Amino acid sequence: MARNKEALVLLLDVGPSMHGVLQEVENICSTLVHKKLVYNRSDEIGVVLFGTKETSNELAKELGGYKHVVVARDIKVVDEETTNALQNLPRGTSPGDFLDAIVVGLDMLIRKFGNIKGKQRMCLVTDAQHPLRDPPQGTKKDQVDTIADQMKRHEIKMDCIIFRESGVRHNAVMDENDQLLYHFRERSVTKVVHVDSPTSLLGALRTRNVLPVTVFRGDLEVSSSFKIKVWVYKKTSEEKFPTLKKYSDKAPASDKFASHEVKVDYEYKSVLEPDTVVPPDQRIKGYLYGPQVVPISSAEWEAVKFKPEKGVKLLGFTDRSSISRHYFMKDVFSFVPEPGNTKAVAAVSALARAMSEMNKVAILRCVWRQGQGNVALGVLTPNISSAKNVLDSFYFNILPFAEDIREFQFRSFSSLPSSSQPTKEQQEAADNLVKMLDLAPPGREEILKPDFTPNPMLERFYRYLDLKSKQPDANVPPLDKCLKKITEPDPDVIDYQAPLIKKLGNVFELKENPKKKKARTQDRLTYTGADDQAKLLEEPSAEKVGVSEALYPPKKKAGEIGDHNPVQDFEAMLTQRSSSTWVQTAIEEMQKYITALIQDSCDRDNHQKALECLVALRKACIIEQEPNEYNGFVTKLCQKFRPAGDKIFLQLLSSKKASLISKEEAPDSDVTEEMARNFCLKPEPSSQ
């Protein structure tokens, strides 16, 4: 077998006690096939059903026994027929014997591959509730030993998923079956997990088998004279959507070996000589540095790069409490002792247990590869194993440097006035809401465990991809019931706690929140805190008055616009927060002043001054988010003075770019950019 190729046999219990969950079993197995069609198209899958009414397997034909076990699909390369074999699973009528199913699956793998080494795996899904038949010789435990020895000899692994809904009472038969499966775990490479809901079942089966690859093999250097041989793997890594690629449909449909690949090639040409292609050795990257572009060649850039030596060094120890959880970055790594190195195993175990007892963590400096351009600084946390055949290890999380940290200071709730803090009744209602939606209530299993919770977006994508391959015009189906339990609160809990939710809505009265005006720069400079806003509106502080006077020295009493410096008077009015309508008052005063200037103009000598005031008004209306006030005023001016034949004023209005405020300048405006551009070009009304 190829190194990355896997042979998998699914052992599915379809007995009467599993009927309620077979739909979810079909879904998870189908998702497994969908992912293999995307990532591992050369993998092979076989399907064995047990608990069926019929019997159909090679061992039953040759040796007898192994009843109610059916080979639904021989081990073949994964294809669409595999998905069909996993749809509409038969509802069996007999209790399932999982030991018989394991023997049949093991026999299929040995017949198919013999002594050929490769990745071979069996996956058992059962509730293990029914008694198993007694073997012809020895005990059931002896039978498990025999099967486990064969699995070890042929390097065959097994995953066991035991599904039992919460509330099912354990009996002697279940305990015996669980012990037999745990014995598999002790004697061979077997993983046993218990799930109690269809949603957990979706995440229990590894639908994509990712080959573990070390990111580092070498010494964990505690000191110059104390080094431990370790291997480092990735513990977690984000599973992303398959990469969308360009494919061509030009190849004939009959050509099975067509790659349908689209190759893209880029050519760089000179601006001065558009027909000349610039070769790679004449191209160079540039970096913006202020207004200029600084060219840096690849050779220069390599010389600038930091090139530390490969290695992992321990810098020191610190209390676990001194490293905040929110500082962890990127992926999680697992440090394990070098396989087969007993001294490394003992050293890692001793160090991990000492750190655990003292509640300490270690700070490491890591350079995974020679020539790596960056250094990782991180925290090493001990992971003490509770299983007999699993070694102690460490988890490693990368920590941020000073440049990576984003500090956002927020005010404490305790500093808010009493009117902004919740009442005792409101706090009690909020506490009850948190308790109601607790995913790990006392006395119950945790809901939505990360190990058993699949990504609903990925699950839905693969199902839709399969549907689209069969029905090109198919619409996106509604979200599956099991996936809804991941993305939405449990509807049973919501219905049961309806009175509590209603009470929560009653104690928090909803009020309309009016749109706030955007604070100007000078206002931000004088802002002293939310607690003092009311006081500031009534009595401006000396500091605020000083800053305002420095920015906008008042020429006369605020509230009046004089003839000497009308623009500065208007700006002074805007800085004077004497009431809640201070902006509106200033705008209205400036509108009156501009209208009076134009009306009282002799030989149009005030037009220039009026336009300067109009430009200032336009700028203020954009800043204070009052575009409609300005647009309405300018429209009235044009309607009033266009019939009077004042074309010079309208021409000046256009030349000074004091036309209407468009949506591009202020989102609240009702005027498009084209309307604003053509506003002053409207034809005069006919005199007829």
From Swiss-Prot:
Q: What SMART domains does the annotation carry?
A: Ku78
Q: Which residues form the Ku domain?
A: 222-430
On the tree of life, the source organism's domain of life is: Eukaryota
Identify the main location: nucleus
DNA-binding keyword on record:
yes
Cellular compartment(s): Nucleus
E.C. number: 3.6.4.12
Catalytic activity from the UniProt record: ATP + H2O = ADP + phosphate + H(+)
Q: Which InterPro entries match?
A: Ku70/Ku80_beta-barrel_dom, Ku80, Ku_C, Ku_C_sf, Ku_N, Ku_PK_bind, SPOC-like_C_dom_sf, vWFA_dom_sf
One GO biological-process annotation of the entry reads:
DNA recombination
Give any GO molecular function from the UniProt entry: ATP binding
Gene Ontology CC annotation, any one: Ku70:Ku80 complex
Q: Give the keywords, sorted.
A: ATP-binding, DNA damage, DNA recombination, DNA repair, DNA-binding, Helicase, Hydrolase, Nucleotide-binding, Nucleus
Write out the function statement from the record: Single-stranded DNA-dependent ATP-dependent helicase. Involved in DNA non-homologous end joining (NHEJ) required for double-strand break repair. When associated with KU70, binds to double-stranded telomeric and non-telomeric DNA sequences, but not to single-stranded DNA. Plays a role in maintaining telomere length. Acts as a negative regulator of telomerase.
What do we know about how this protein assembles, alone or with others? Interacts with KU70.
Q: Which family is this protein grouped under?
A: Belongs to the ku80 family.
Supply the name of the protein: ATP-dependent DNA helicase 2 subunit KU80
| Annotated organism of origin | Oryza sativa subsp. japonica (Rice)
Q: Which gene encodes it?
A: KU80
